Structure formats: C-alpha cells, structure tokens
Swiss-Prot record:
Localisation: Cytoplasm
Pathway of action: Purine metabolism; AMP biosynthesis via salvage pathway; AMP from adenine: step 1/1
Species of provenance: Saccharomyces cerevisiae (strain ATCC 204508 / S288c) (Baker's yeast)
Protein name listed in UniProt: Adenine phosphoribosyltransferase 2
Further comment found in the protein's record: Present with 937 molecules/cell in log phase SD medium.
E.C. numbers: 2.4.2.7
Any GO CC annotation of this UniProt entry: cytoplasm
InterPro entries documented for this protein: PRibTrfase_dom, PRTase-like, UPRTase/APRTase
Length: 181
C-alpha cells in the first residue's frame, strides 16, 4: 500500500455524515474533523501535493483556486506547500475591487460566485480545489469564472467524489479525488 493510499484510509475514517442536511433527503459529508486534527490535515495536504507534483511538476501550476467555503480551508495550505499563489472564489459581496461573477443554481436556489479580476493573470494554469464533488454545478461555475479571465484549468481536485451523482460529467478538465463514495 502506498503512502497516499494509507493516508486516504485515515482521512476517510475522519469524515462525519449528517442525514437531512442541508435539506431533507440529503446526506452531508463533513470533512471538518480532518482540519481539526493537525496530523490528518498535514496528510491531506501531502496527498494532494504529491499527486500534483507527480502529474504536473512544480513549474506548470501557477495558482490553486479554492471554492467557498471548504476549498478556502485547505486551498491556501496546499498552495503554500506547492509554492504557488492562492485565489479565493467567494460568494457575491465578499471580495473588494473589480470582480468577475457567475450565477448558477445550487440545490434549490441561485448563487453567485465572484473572483477578483486581477487575481489570476491571463494564460495562467490553475487547479481548482473543494471538499466534495456532488452534482458538479459549483465546480463548473468556478471553472467558468476562471475561464472568464483567460486562465486554464489543469484539474479539479476534491477530498471526496460522490460517484453516484456523476458531477465529473459537467467538468471540462480532469478530476482527482482522494476518496470516492
């Protein structure tokens, strides 16, 4: 068993499940206990870092873009570990300055994401990170926002992919996930 496989098993045991959250009929996969455990959090970042260095090499990735809310929790640590920049993708009204925006539907309501226009230079290479890939709508919107400013998405990286929802079918770049369910 590789180190990454061993780490994935440890990470999986830390997830907590909440039934009927955020809406009735849904099961929420909570990865916050991982961040509360420094050893597991380091293993999470190490697993992503190792994967990205093996796949792309340090010179090819320019930015990690973290999707609000949970992508903002581990994205900066991953960017720091890789020695690249970090860019937050936030809900409307959370970022100062000129922002690009996109409106999308999530579950039963519309949301708007924004990103500062000057945060990612034209032609940059970006990896998008978030905790869970479900239907793919949130990740798709984040990717569309990054493409609006002329950057390239190398990959979408997730802690967990809910395979039964086929979210990867909406995405135009490869995905990587530590766990699948």
């Amino acid at each position: 068993m590789s180190i990454s496989e061993s780490y994935a098993k440890e990470i999986k045991t830390a997830f907590r499940q909440f039934t009927d959250f955020p809406i009735e009929g849904e099961q929420f996969e909570d990865f916050l206990p991982i961040i509360g455990n420094p050893t597991l959090f380091q293993k999470l970042v190490h697993t992503f870092k190792t994967h990205l260095e093996e796949k792309f090499g340090k010179e090819k990735i320019d930015f990690i873009a973290g999707i609000e809310a949970r992508g903002l929790l581990f994205g900066p640590s991953l960017a720091l570990a890789l020695g690249v920049g970090f860019v937050p993708i936030r809900r409307v009204g959370k970022l100062p300055g000129e922002c690009a925006s996109i409106t999308f539907t999530k579950l039963d309501h519309e949301e708007i994401f924004e990103m500062q226009v000057e945060a990612i230079p034209f032609d940059s290479n970006v990896v998008v990170v978030d905790d869970v890939l479900a239907t793919g709508g949130t990740a798709y919107a984040a990717g569309d926002l990054i493409r609006q400013v002329g950057a390239h998405i190398l990959e979408y990286d997730f802690v967990l992919v809910l395979d039964s929802l086929h979210g990867e079918e909406k995405l135009s770049a490869p995905i990587f996930s530590i766990l699948h369910s």
